[in-house]
Amino acid sequence: MKKTYRVKREKDFQAIFKDGKSTANRKFVIYHLNRSQDHFRVGISVGKKIGNAVTRNAVKRKIRHVIMALGHQLKSEDFVVIARKGVESLEYQELQQNLHHVLKLAQLLEKGFESEEKH
């Protein structure tokens, strides 16, 4: 994932948490904030309750892969994906479905792509 597609600074994370809207399902919470830019930016947070560093990094890699696969469908907003406990035990396909579901609930998918439930 290119650096231009990442939310990295603490100031940006805090702005999204403070001024953005949140949406959640059982496995993910998404905070999103509309910004005037030509592409999306994403931050990923996996807490220490999820497991050891190896497990957390594996979860982050899977989330990053799903986000980049859906990249052409995402609206130009900043958003933060927070993984909840239990996400570490999901297979890739289940993680993809859960993440797609919460993005759809947050209305972060462009019109026309929302009907594509399964890939």
From Swiss-Prot:
Gene3D superfamilies: 3.30.230.10
Protein known as: Ribonuclease P protein component
GO CC field: ribonuclease P complex
InterPro entries according to UniProt: Ribosomal_Su5_D2-typ_SF, Ribsml_uS5_D2-typ_fold_subgr, RNase_P, RNase_P_CS
Oligomer and partners: Consists of a catalytic RNA component (M1 or rnpB) and a protein subunit.
Record function comment: RNaseP catalyzes the removal of the 5'-leader sequence from pre-tRNA to produce the mature 5'-terminus. It can also cleave other RNA substrates such as 4.5S RNA. The protein component plays an auxiliary but essential role in vivo by binding to the 5'-leader sequence and broadening the substrate specificity of the ribozyme.
Enzyme Commission designation: 3.1.26.5
Keywords assigned by UniProt, alphabetized: Endonuclease, Hydrolase, Nuclease, RNA-binding, tRNA processing
Family: Belongs to the RnpA family.
GO biological process, any: tRNA 5'-leader removal
